[in-house]
Amino acid sequence: MSNTTVTQKRRTLKVAKSSKTLNVSSGVFRPNQSTTKSINPLFSGKSFGSTGDSKVVDKISAQTPKHTAMVVDENGQDVTPHPLYNPDPGVLQSKQGKVFTALDTSLTTMTEFPSIAFQTTNASLTGPFTRSFFGSASASRISQTAESVTDETKDLLVKQDLSNSISDIQSHREEPKEQLRENILDSTANCYLSETETIWLLDIPAVSVSVESEDAEAVKERNNAYTELCKNRQGNDKYVERSMQTFSDASKTKEVQCDSITMVDKAVMCTVWDMYDSFNNISDVSANTVVSSERHEATIPESSSEGHLVHPKRSNQSLSVVSTVSTVSGSSTHIEKMACVLPLDEEPDLQLILQSDKLKQDLALMERVVLANVFQPKLAAYRQLPIIEDPDCVQMVMEEESWTEQSKNSHCPFLERLWDFSCELTMGRNVSCMVWNKKNPDLLAVGYGQVEFKNPNSGLVCCWSLKNPTWPDRVFHCESGVTALDFSASNANQLAVGMYDGTIAIYNVQTSEQTPITDSSDCANLHTSPVWQLTWIDHEDGLAADKGEILVSVSSDGRISKWIHYKSMECVDLMKLKIHDLQWKRHISSLTPGMCFDFHPNDSKIYLVGTEEGHIHKCSSSYNEQYLESYKAHKRPVYKVTWSPFCSDVFLSCSSDWTIQLWRQDLQIPVMGFTSGQRVVFDIMWSPHCATVFGAVSEGKVEIWDLRVSSLDPTLVNWTSPGVNPTALLFSPETDCVLVGDSEGQVTVYKLKNITAGGGSQGETLEDVIQSTLSSQH
């Protein structure tokens, strides 16, 4: 919108008749072409028929007057309204023919007639959109043709006016757009913007003005005058009180529906300890506040009736005097003053209560009591205790009874799932290692890392308790992925943690401090590759300073080291794993990476170590130059090697070559070989209760082997969920349960069913199986 000044002037409209023709130059046609239009008066409002031929105009001109309705104002200016609809000249047909016959069906309105009738071609026709509308020949032809129109034709045209006027308007065609050229696109288009006047949509006058405004003084004067007027109104004869009658609207009764009012009885229970604590508080207050004036003149001033009494032992507690009683004895003038005081009620600080250690301990104890009730059937099955039936849980009992009946009828070994250790912190993490506390068998430490350690920058250690399977008691965040764990036997609160970056740290599980007691970061001879296993060993040889429990580790840097920590950790190499295979000597390093090790159960100097080249070496801590024995059967890295707890000459090994080997230390070749599929075996472990039973985990399944039953197939196989791989296995030291950690961060507890140890000595049973196997080989 542009800022324009509009002059409102009352115009006088006049209607004048004129037969003048109006020459209009249309922009649709070529330059130097004009159109001659004759505007006829619209006095009858009738409709006339029209075909596509231009000669229809000649017939109509003879019947209608040749006068044009013109509107002029008082100044003589032409203000005649233009027609609302201007048809496109391209719509008209170029064919010449007879028009206005009796069978014409195409109609048009009178308002459209001037525009259509006078768009006739002149004597010269050069092509589409090149007609000339000038000349008198066109006007004379219109006059001669229009006179031949009969009255019947006019009546027919009037009757069809209404139905065809709308269709004629809808026949408007969009004007052709001008074709864009490069010179037009490159030209500069000027756009002019102008500011419009302010449009007020809402204007609320203010009831206050600024002190700095010009009207501030006037407003103050009016306010002061009004204040004085209000003061002088009382008692002034100029003001008379009058009573006015007002109309009270008729009241209407309405009903409202609401909820029914229910009465509830409430009761408060007063327990024995509440009464005991209340009675003790009253007794303490009475004993401390009833004092004698002779014995406590220094502590009770004379003005105590108006002030407060403060007990020496409770100087931080404000007391108020509620009564003072004076008694006079008849036989003496001894006056005793007794004052009864009560402590003032002070609101406790809720924030301090919530942050107190006492509240945390109480909540932890309460949580364990509640979870003991919830997990009672599962914990009882784990500890091999009788299950207490819950009368309110009939459905669960029926399901357990049906499951028990099926298991009794089948007599087949199977794994019964009890529960799993998992929380939000462990979801999506890989369980890399697990270990029991040597003094507290209910405490389990689990190490977490990333799958295949693609992201070694996030490690986690959780200490789980059987008393709370839903949340760990201790959580330690590590800078790198956790690869190895072990509890100390002499100091059960110390947990050694090996990490993927080669760091070894020792944490105190008695506290929740995230800072370790000590670590190997300051040691000059620390590991430079992942630490795959840690073990605390009682070392009795050497000097007095070297005796005691030491920590032994194996790493991918090819070293087996022992760690002694007093103020800091010191490292000494027990063995450097030299490359034994000629194929591995092509590598730059002369040491082969160590993957696992295990010390002999009866001789702490002897230990086995598994390497990445697939060999198992028997070593001694007293001699670090050469291997005592080497066992070569695996073709890929050895992930686990473990001595039998019942037979000290037998050990197991597993590898990524899909096999499990049973060895006897006096033989260079394995006694037995086990495989159940083309899958990598991640972990193995002997059962602590049966000499012939061991467990193994591979990709997608858990296997339990019993050598008494079969040495070809596992006794039972438990398949995991699709996409979940078990990564670690651990037997319970006191019950027939096995724990399985997987790649999703869950540690599932299973109970072994229908697997019992045979009669006689466990070691002899395993020896008999080995001897029978060796006899069959010869």
UniProtKB/Swiss-Prot annotation:
Highest taxon above the source species: Eukaryota
PANTHER family per the UniProt record, alphabetical: DYNEIN AXONEMAL INTERMEDIATE CHAIN 4, DYNEIN INTERMEDIATE CHAIN
GO biological process per UniProt: axonemal dynein complex assembly; cilium movement
Alphabetically ordered keywords of this record: Cell projection, Cilium, Cytoplasm, Cytoskeleton, Flagellum, Repeat, WD repeat
Organism of derivation: Danio rerio (Zebrafish)
WD repeats: 477-517, 526-573, 586-629, 633-673, 676-715, 721-760
Underlying gene: dnai4
Free-text function comment from the UniProt entry: Plays a critical role in the assembly of axonemal dynein complex. Plays a key role in ciliary motility.
Disruption-associated phenotype: Morpholino knockdown results in ciliopathy-related phenotypes, such as curved bodies, hydrocephalus, abnormal otolith, randomized left-right asymmetry, and pronephric cysts, accompanied with paralyzed pronephric cilia.
GO molecular function: dynein heavy chain binding; dynein light chain binding
Subcellular location: Cytoplasm, Cytoskeleton, Flagellum axoneme; Cytoplasm, Cytoskeleton, Cilium axoneme; Dynein axonemal particle
The protein's name in its UniProt record: Dynein axonemal intermediate chain 4
Assembly description: Part of the multisubunit axonemal dynein complex formed at least of two heavy chains and a number of intermediate and light chains.
GO annotation, cellular component aspect: axonemal dynein complex; axoneme; dynein axonemal particle; motile cilium
